[in-house]
């Protein structure tokens, strides 16, 4: 391994003159060095999970499960079962998160267990499609609910929607670049806001039940089918329910910034996912106290229709709640996706500048700018919804691959420290459930799934050219070094130190012995920037 890559984890960065780096003491997590801060406590950790799971779906279109389940009772069962399966998957990720205590989530786990190519493909599909498209869609939903009251008789102009979505992305990127604490406070506030809005829906549902409005909750009516029962549609209902819980694994992307991750990672999971399951189930119960299944399926914004029926002049609360929920969702996604790209760059799978952090704010500014720019590019395309359909299958495929990796790790390395060790029955249950859903997805939409696989496999030549090929032309290396140096000076960023004795340090050293990074700076660049006077 060349010295340049080793320098990434060098914790003794000095000035050219031989003195220590002048990064402020508060910047690092220890010893005055520049490092990611451990600022995410239990409350903020719960906010990240809840805020990323609960987006606009439960307010706007929870009807996907009901439409395919065929009855209210079966739909509620689907919500409960998918919540339970999500808890099982989260328990598997909790064990992996404390066994491999690195940011990057399933990307880091897949890479460490199955090798660089498998990890790169997970990162490739996330960088290329998943995060940019999802963030663009959430931002567009936010702008739609903000602008719709200004255009009561028509749809808001498309250009206005995209402009406001871009402003939302730029504002939240600035917040995340400025301070981890600001970003987590924004997440906490907007998560609390969406939970209060859902609590209002649930309370109104309880009031409706007390008034005797529970026709569709009586067993004889709850299981009355409004369409012919079909096992394929029931499977699709489970798939829709699983999509609604998407984001449950996002806390694993920021493991290194958690305060006491060995305790707070599992605690946040145990608190957040049962809470989300409770909210999802009882919000749907509340909806059917005010609307029949047919009315619910006909509504384009279920919570808004619910509010119009029960809130009267206060019905405006619901669209505002959707807007607040999506705003918080964009913030949470920017926060976690930037850490994924940061982790990928640190492993040598993305340009190395993305693995740098600001010398005083200790935020991964290059990674945040990267995810923001890629999302803005998606905003100007017209095919992002199609792309989401294509790669949704791949995203959930990697959930199964990651959990399978837990079993492989138990077999290959049975003696490594595991602060949390769950029964192997849990990953087996999870894998059986996901095998059923993935096989059904392949059977029902083979073309869509095939295109998704093809998009993922475009990463194979990129991996061999960018990562595996070690002896690149000197002109290419010189250009990348120049680009890295310019980016460092523009963003005032350096490589972070790695805390001694952490699992991250050992994992990075193992990585360096096994593979060459995609882009590799020389050691002097970091020192040059560290020696610059800071603004």
Swiss-Prot record:
Record PTM Phosphoserine, positions in chain: 29
Mutagenesis / variant outcome for changing residue 134 to S: The substrate specificity changed dramatically reducing L-glutamine, glycine and L-alanine uptake activity thus mimicking the selectivity of SLC7A5
Recorded catalytic activity of this chain's protein: L-histidine(in) + L-phenylalanine(out) = L-histidine(out) + L-phenylalanine(in); L-tryptophan(in) + L-phenylalanine(out) = L-tryptophan(out) + L-phenylalanine(in); L-isoleucine(in) + L-phenylalanine(out) = L-isoleucine(out) + L-phenylalanine(in); L-valine(in) + L-phenylalanine(out) = L-valine(out) + L-phenylalanine(in)
Transmembrane region(s): 45-65, 74-95, 117-149, 158-178, 182-210, 231-252, 266-287, 313-338, 365-382, 387-408, 424-446, 447-466
Pfam families noted in UniProt: AA_permease_2
Residues engaged in binding L-leucine: 53, 246
Single GO term (MF): amino acid transmembrane transporter activity
Cytoplasmic side: 1-44, 96-116, 179-181, 253-265, 339-364, 409-423, 467-535
Regions of compositional bias (Polar residues) in chain numbering: 514-523
Tissue: Strongest expression is observed in kidney and moderate expression in placenta and brain, followed by liver, prostate, testis, ovary, lymph node, thymus, spleen, skeletal muscle and heart. Also expressed in fetal liver as well as in the retinal pigment epithelial cell line ARPE-19 and the intestinal epithelial cell line Caco-2.
Extracellular side: 66-73, 150-157, 211-230, 288-312, 383-386
GO biological process: amino acid import across plasma membrane; amino acid transmembrane transport; amino acid transport; glycine transport; L-alanine import across plasma membrane; L-leucine import across plasma membrane; L-leucine transport; neutral amino acid transport
Xref: InterPro entries: AA/rel_permease1 (IPR002293), AminoAcid_Transporter (IPR050598), L_AA_transporter (IPR004760)
Regulation: Inhibited by the L-type inhibitor 2-Aminobicyclo-(2,2,1)-heptane-2-carboxylic acid (BCH).
Mutagenesis / variant outcome for changing residue 243 to A: Abolishes leucine and tryptophan transport activities
Residues annotated to bind L-tryptophan: 134, 395
Family stated for the protein in its record: Belongs to the amino acid-polyamine-organocation (APC) superfamily. L-type amino acid transporter (LAT) (TC 2.A.3.8) family.
Subunit structure: Disulfide-linked heterodimer composed of the catalytic light chain subunit SLC7A8 and the heavy chain subunit SLC3A2. SLC3A2 acts as chaperones for correct plasma membrane trafficking and stabilization of SLC7A8 and modulates the substrate affinity and specificity of SLC7A8. ICAM-1 associates with the heterodimer SLC3A2/SLC7A8; this interaction regulates SLC7A8 activity.
Function: Associates with SLC3A2 to form a functional heterodimeric complex that translocates small and large neutral amino acids with broad specificity and a stoichiometry of 1:1. Functions as amino acid antiporter mediating the influx of extracellular essential amino acids mainly in exchange with the efflux of highly concentrated intracellular amino acids. Has relatively symmetrical selectivities but strongly asymmetrical substrate affinities at both the intracellular and extracellular sides of the transporter.
The protein's name: Large neutral amino acids transporter small subunit 2
Native organism: Homo sapiens
UniProt lineage: Eukaryota, Metazoa, Chordata, Craniata, Vertebrata
């Amino acid at each position: 391994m060349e010295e340049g890559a080793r320098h990434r984890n060098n914790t003794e960065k000095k000035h050219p003159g031989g003195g220590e780096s002048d990064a402020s003491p508060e910047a690092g997590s220890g010893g005055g060095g520049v490092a990611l801060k451990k600022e995410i406590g239990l409350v903020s950790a719960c906010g990240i999970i809840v805020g990323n799971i609960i987006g606009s779906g439960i307010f706007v279109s929870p009807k996907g499960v009901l439409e395919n389940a065929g009855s209210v009772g079966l739909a509620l069962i689907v919500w409960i079962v998918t919540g339970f399966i999500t808890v099982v998957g989260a328990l598997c990720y909790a064990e992996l998160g404390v066994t491999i205590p690195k940011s990057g989530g399933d990307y880091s786990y897949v890479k460490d267990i199955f090798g660089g190519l498998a990890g790169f493909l997970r990162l490739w599909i996330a960088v290329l499609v998943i995060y940019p498209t999802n963030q663009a869609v959430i931002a567009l939903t936010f702008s739609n609910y903000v602008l719709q009251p200004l255009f009561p008789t028509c749809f808001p102009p498309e250009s206005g929607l995209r402009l406001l979505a871009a402003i939302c992305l730029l504002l939240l990127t600035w917040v995340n670049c400025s301070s981890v604490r600001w970003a987590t406070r924004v997440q906490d506030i907007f998560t609390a806001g969406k939970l209060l809005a859902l609590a209002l829906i649930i309370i109104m549902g309880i009031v409706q039940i007390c008034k005797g409005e529970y026709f569709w909750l009586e067993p004889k009516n709850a299981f009355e089918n409004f369409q012919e029962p079909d096992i394929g549609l029931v499977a699709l209902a489970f798939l829709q329910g699983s999509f609604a819980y998407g984001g449950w694994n996002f806390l694993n992307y920021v493991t290194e910034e958690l305060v006491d991750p060995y305790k707070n990672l599992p605690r946040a999971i145990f608190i957040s996912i049962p809470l989300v399951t409770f909210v999802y189930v009882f919000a749907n119960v509340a909806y059917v106290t005010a609307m029949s299944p047919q009315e619910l399926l006909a509504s384009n914004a279920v919570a808004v229709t619910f509010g119009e029926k029960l809130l009267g002049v206060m019905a405006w609360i619901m669209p505002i709640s959707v807007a607040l929920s999506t705003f918080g969702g964009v913030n949470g996604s920017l926060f976690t996706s930037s850490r994924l790209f940061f982790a990928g760059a640190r492993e040598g799978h993305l340009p190395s500048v993305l693995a740098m952090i600001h010398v005083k704010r200790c935020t991964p500014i290059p990674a945040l700018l990267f995810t923001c720019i890629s999302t803005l590019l998606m905003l100007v395309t017209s095919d992002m919804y199609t792309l989401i359909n294509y790669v949704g299958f791949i995203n959930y495929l990697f959930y199964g691959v990651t959990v399978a990796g837990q079993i492989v790790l138990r077999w290959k390395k049975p003696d490594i420290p595991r602060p949390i060790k769950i029964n192997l029955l849990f990953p087996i249950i999870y894998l059986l459930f996901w095998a059923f859903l993935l096989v059904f997805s392949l059977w029902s939409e083979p073309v869509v799934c095939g295109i998704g696989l093809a998009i993922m496999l475009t990463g194979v030549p990129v991996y061999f050219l960018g990562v595996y090929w070690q002896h690149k032309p000197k002109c290419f290396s010189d250009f990348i070094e120049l680009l890295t140096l310019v980016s460092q000076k523009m963003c005032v960023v350096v490589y972070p130190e790695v805390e001694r004795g952490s699992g991250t340090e050992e994992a990075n050293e193992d990585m360096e012995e096994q593979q060459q990074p995609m882009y590799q700076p020389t050691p002097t660049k970091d020192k040059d920037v560290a020696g610059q006077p800071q603004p």
